[in-house]
C-alpha cells in the first residue's frame, strides 16, 4: 500500500520549506492564516459552481479571485484523517489517525508526530488553533501540547457533541463520565486548560462566532507584539448535521446547507476584513480548504458535484475538495 505524503500535504510542506529557505528579519516573515470548513465540497463554493448551484460565497471567492483557485486538490475521506494529514504533512497511516475521533478514545496525535506549529516555532512564530480539532480526546492530544500557544475549540464532530441531548442517550453519570463529550476547551502551552462548558445544540448556533472572535483576538495580539503568526481556524460549518440561529435559518431560500454556508462565508469575511484593518493583508498567506468531501450531493447544495461519491467513500467526491490560496 502506498503510504507517501498526499500531494496537497506535500505542497504545504514545500511551501513552508521555501518560506524559510533564506534567513529573513522577523518583520519579513509572512503571517499564515489557514481556514478550514467542515464537510465542504467544491460546488458548495460559488467560485467553483459559477451560479449553477444555490448559494453564494463572496468572501471565499475573494480569496480565490485575489490568489489561486485549486481544481485538483485532495484531502482525506473523513474529518480526523483530513485534519491529521494537513497539520502533520503525513499520511494518516503513519499517525494512525484514520478514523473519526470519538469521546473517550485513546487515539490522538503522538509526541513524535510533527505539526506545522512545531516547525514554525523555531522561526519566531506564535501559533493558535481555533474551532474543531478532532485529533484526540485526552489532554495530551490537545493542540497546545503539539506546538500551538493557544487553543479554543471543540474536540469532535457535531453529532457526538449533541448526543447527551438525545432521548436515547444513557442517563448514567458513570457512562457520561467515561464516554461523554468534553466541552469547548480553552488551553494554553503553559498547561492551563479550561472547559468552558458543553457544545449544546443551542451553542452550536453561534459557536463559529466564538471561534472566529478568538482567532481575531489572537491575531490582534500577535500584531501588537510584533510577532509573525500561524492561525488555523476550523469552522463547524458546514457539517451535515448542524444547528442554525434564527438569523441565518432561511437566509438564502435554498435550505439549511446554503444557509450555513452563508454564515460560514460571512465569518470568513470578518477575518479577512480584520487583516485589512490591521494593515497586514499583504504580508499574510491565506489558505482556505476543508477536511473531506461533502455529504450533500446535488442541487441546490452542490456538494460533491461533479464527482461520484461523498464523505467516507474512496470515490473522488469523498476527498477531492475546494482549496484557494492568497498571498499578495
Where on the chain are the PLM-derived regions?
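N-terminal secretory signal peptides that target proteins for export/translocation
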Residues: 1-8
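Formylglycine-dependent sulfatase
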Residues: 2, 14-328
Amino acid at each position: 500500500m502506498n503510504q507517501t505524503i498526499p500531494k496537497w500535504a506535500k505542497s504545504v510542506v514545500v511551501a513552508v520549506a521555501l518560506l524559510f529557505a533564506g534567513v529573513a528579519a522577523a518583520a519579513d516573515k509572512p503571517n499564515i492564516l489557514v481556514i478550514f470548513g467542515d464537510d465542504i465540497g467544491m460546488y458548495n463554493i460559488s467560485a467553483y459552481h459559477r451560479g449553477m448551484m444555490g448559494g453564494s460565497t463572496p468572501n471565499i471567492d475573494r480569496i480565490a479571485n485575489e490568489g489561486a483557485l485549486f481544481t485538483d486538490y485532495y484531502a482525506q475521506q473523513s474529518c480526523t484523517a483530513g485534519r491529521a494529514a494537513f497539520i502533520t504533512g503525513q499520511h494518516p497511516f503513519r499517525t494512525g489517525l484514520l478514523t473519526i475521533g470519538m469521546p473517550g478514545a485513546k487515539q490522538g496525535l503522538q509526541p513524535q508526530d510533527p505539526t506545522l506549529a512545531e516547525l514554525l516555532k523555531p522561526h519566531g512564530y506564535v501559533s493558535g488553533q481555533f474551532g474543531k480539532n478532532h485529533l484526540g480526546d485526552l489532554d495530551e492530544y490537545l493542540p497546545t501540547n503539539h506546538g500551538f500557544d493557544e487553543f479554543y475549540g471543540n474536540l469532535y464532530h457535531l453529532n457526538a457533541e449533541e448526543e447527551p441531548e438525545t432521548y436515547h442517550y444513557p442517563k448514567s453519570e458513570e457512562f457520561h463520565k467515561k464516554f461523554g463529550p468534553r466541552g469547548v476547551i480553552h488551553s494554553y502551552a503553559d498547561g492551563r486548560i479550561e472547559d468552558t462548558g458543553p457544545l449544546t445544540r443551542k451553542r452550536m448556533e453561534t459557536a463559529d462566532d466564538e471561534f472566529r472572535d478568538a482567532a481575531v483576538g489572537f491575531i490582534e495580539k500577535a500584531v501588537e507584539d510584533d510577532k509573525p503568526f500561524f492561525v488555523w481556524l476550523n469552522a463547524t460549518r458546514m457539517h451535515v448535521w448542524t444547528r442554525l440561529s434564527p438569523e441565518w435559518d432561511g437566509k438564502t431560500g435554498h435550505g439549511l446547507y446554503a444557509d450555513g454556508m452563508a454564515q460560514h462565508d460571512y465569518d470568513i469575511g470578518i477575518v479577512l476584513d480584520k487583516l485589512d484593518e490591521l494593515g497586514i493583508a499583504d504580508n499574510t498567506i491565506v489558505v482556505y480548504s476543508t477536511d473531506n468531501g461533502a455529504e450533500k450531493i446535488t442541487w441546490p447544495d452542490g456538494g460533491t458535484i461533479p464527482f461520484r461519491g461523498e464523505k467516507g467513500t474512496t470515490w473522488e467526491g469523498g476527498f477531492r475538495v475546494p482549496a484557494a490560496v492568497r498571498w499578495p
